[in-house]
Structures are given as C-alpha cells and as structure tokens.
Amino acid sequence: MKRNKIALAGTALFVIGALALAGCAAGGTPETEETSSGDPTAVISVNNTEPQNPLIPTNTNEVGGGLVIQSMFAGLVYYDAEGAVHNDVAESIETDDAQTFTIKIKPDQTFTNGDPVDAEAFVTAWNYGAALDNAQLSSYFFESIEGFSYDENVPELSGLKVVDDLTFTVKLKQPESDFPLRLGYTAYFPMPASAWDDLEAFGENPVGNGPYAFEEEGAWKHNERIDLVKNDEYTGPREAQNGGVDMILYASTDAAYADLQGGNLDILQEIPDSALQTFESDFEGRTVNQPAAANATITIPGRLDHFSGEEGILRRQAISHAINREEITDVVFNGTRTPAKDFTSPVIDGYSEEIPGSEVLEFDADEAKKLWAEADAIAPWSGTFEIQYNADGPNQGWVDAIANQLKNNLGIEAAGKPIPTFAEHRTLITERQATTAFRNGWQFDYPSMFNGLGPIYGTDAGSNDGDYSNAEFDALLDEGASAADVEDGIKKFQEAQEILFQELPSIPLWYTNAMGAWGESVESVEFGWDTWPILYQVTKAAE
C-alpha cells in the first residue's frame, strides 16, 4: 500500500517576516471535504470506550475521552483527513521569529451556554493546564511557553498575555517553528468562564464551542453511552452534516461488530480480531484499512523488579528480540498491522527504517537468549512476565501470541493480565498501580515527529507512563524542536531515537492502521490521519 507522508507544514513554512500560519485559511471548508445529501437531523451512532477522566480538555489524553472532546470543542486550528492544518477559531497566527506568536480570534463566537470564545477563554484554560498544582495529564504541552515550571506552581504563565478581547500573545522559551502545528490538539482548546465556577460538574457535563454539544445534562451515561446533538451556534469549517452522534460505550469490539452487522450501529472505528479476515467481505465497499499515525508498544517501567539499570536494559532488549513481529502481524492481524521499525509512524515526515540501533526490533531468538542470560548473571530471573491489557479491546490475541513467543524463545513463564475496561487499564497506569508490563501505544495528537517522542519519553511528560528520564534525550528533543530548518530538526529527533533503541523505555511492536466499517444508511464516511472517523461530515438517510 502506498504510504502518504504527513509533512510538517507549519515548520517548513515559518520564516522571518510576520507570516501567518501556512496552510490555514481564514474560514470555509477545505476543498478535499465533500458535502453529501442526507437528512440533516438524522443522528449517527459510533462505538467508543468509556473516558478515563472527567471531560476536561487539559486532562484528557486517551482516545475514549479524546473523541468526545474533539467533537464538542473547537480549537484555534484543526486537522483535515490528511493531517493538513486549517484555521478553526483562529483568524490568524503570526510570528516574526518563531518564538513570539500573535493570535487573533474570529469575532462573535460563543460556547453553547453563551459565554464568549475570546482570548481569556484560551489563556485561562492554558494557565490551568500548565499549573503544577492542577496535575493535568496534558501539562507537558505547555512546557515550551515562557514561565512553565515542573518544580513550582505557576498560576499564570509569563509567556501568555491577553492583548484585547480577541487577541493574545504566546512567548516561548526558545524559537519553535512547529508550535502552531500543535494548536489543534485538545490540550489547547478554550474553556468557558462558567467552567471555573464548578470544574467537577463541568467535567461531567462539559460546555464546548465545537460542532456538537451534550444532548442534555447527564448525557454521559457512564459505561453505556454519550449522546451528542448538533451545535447550531457553531459556524466554523467543521459544521455537522448530521443531527448528532450517539457514542455507544461497548465492553467489547465483538459486541460492537455484531451491532453493526445487525443494523444497530452506524460506524465501527475498530475491528475485532475475530473479524480481521472477513470484515472487508462482510461490509464490501464500506470499510477502511489504511496507514495512520498510530503505533503499539509494550511499556516495562524501570520500577519493576529486574527492569532497572543495566539488567533492565538487557532484559528489554532480550524481550524485543524474542518477539516475532512479522509472524504476529501476518497471523494474528491478517496483515492489517506493519512491524515497527522506529518509535513514530511511517506516515509522519522524518520516519526512517535506518536509525542506528533499530536492529533491536529484529526477531533473533539466539540473541534474545544471550541477552537474557547476561541479565541473569546480574540477578537471576524468577516468576512470570505478565502483560497488562484492556479486555474491552482487540488485544488478547496478540498478547497471548507474545506470551507464547517469550516462553519459547526465552524459556520463561509469560502470560497476559486482562483488565476489564480501557478506563480501568489507563487508571492503573496513570496512578502507577500497574505491577507488570502493560500494553501501550500512541495515537498522534498532531502530525509531527516530536509529538511521537516528547510527550511519551520526555522527562516528566504527561504520557510518560514508564517514568523514563534521560537528560541527553531531552536535550536532543529541545534541539530538534528549536531547529530553524525542518531537516535539521528531523536529524535531532532521529538521534534521540538512537537513545531509545538502546534503553527501550517502551518496546515498539507495530504500526496501527486506521480500520473500520460502516452501515448502509450512512455516507461520506472518512477516517483521518489519526485513525478517527471524521464524524461531522457523515450523512445519514432519513429513517
């Protein structure tokens, strides 16, 4: 299958001279999007997972909550199906030096409760997300802004200034020309003034400014469904072509697949293992299987017995060599995954299969045994190597396959450790209560190599689930982010990966395709660069 690179459009096109964000239009829908006839009041349904946390943009960093936030809020920019950047709430984003940015907001925009979408709505939300005391999972995304600190609470970042109702400025600690490219991620979304009256209540019943809104108070029925309706007040480029979205929170993808077959679900955004060989014939002409900016990994925290220091590095390398990725992607996934060659994704600009050290991802049972024996010489292994995973997703098949390979190739006991739901799985991880290795992965927030590295492996980053820290790696990330030339930045990010290949804070497994299927009653179904279906453009026939 042809691989389409997602270029760092923002980085390549920022030069000195007060240029507006390249690739952003002042308004309107990108030409690549099509409108289709259908009942504008018809409600579509899609499967989803229970969000891990209350629905606050700066504290949502997983896919279940992310799909809801993305649907209910509008940021300064958004990404189309190919990952190109377009203005949404922003009228312009300008800079002379890639360090200080002036952001102007389109006038007359409101949240669904009538609060204005103004400069304060962004600055207050960003300050909250960045402050140490608030412990927001996405705080890392504000690290570049002047005044941010991991060591002390900073209620108001010195790099954020409100100029007037519709204008604010952002000053970074150093020039970072891809900064505007990040601004479509949920962490940078605005929040209404009313949210701060009772943030706990807001998390259960969020008020946004995007294409959709909660159908009513209490529309989030936990572990059952989240019902959204079209937000008629939203006038941006993502205007919904349907009457709303019912997000059904399934306990398993097999159940969701059965509902799609039975006509009780419109869009399925994940295919269960049991249907990988049949889904394209079951829904002929109504499926997607395409490369996307997502990957799968196993994280083995250094705090676990036998996985710290030199012993831990040797054991991670041994486990990586003991995994036959080709066999699993062919047999378990029926060719719908691609064995990993790096820590990012083939559709991200800068991807390379030739980074020194990447040979640790090659299957080599003899080398695996050798490395494991070297680790045993430091401290003999005992017990069972377990891999925690969420049972409500299609994970058991590949986890069992890896466990069997580790048994055969390392001579150890290995097994999966199922957790009922994705939300419970993530909570154990984020609260550092996971006592084993665990299934992990990354769905890119914005199309940049930095996003596949910094938020996951940078020291103190919000999605650094294994608490990895390496000063040399952090320095290379900073150098790459501040590089004036795109290619220079990519080289630094590739050098940073050399360190990851040596220490393996996570073990890359494979790249995840965007896979899904849909029913006969919906049209204009398209899955984006980030694996998500683009819900606002879906149309549905009248029932």
Model regions: which residues?
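Detector for C-terminal structural segments
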Residues: 19, 323-350, 394-405, 427-543
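N-terminal lobe/hinge region of extracytoplasmic solute-binding protein
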Residues: 47-97, 207
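A structural "hinge/loop" feature
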Residues: 48-67, 89, 115, 178-190, ...
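Surface-exposed binding/hinge segments that line
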Residues: 94, 139-193
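Alpha-helical secondary-structure segments
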Residues: 117-127, 165-171, 211, 242-244, ...
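Gly/Pro-rich hinge or "lid" segments in bacterial periplasmic/extracellular proteins
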Residues: 176-239, 244
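Ligand-site clamp/hinge motif
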Residues: 206, 233-278, 293
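Structural transition elements
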Residues: 338-375, 392-397
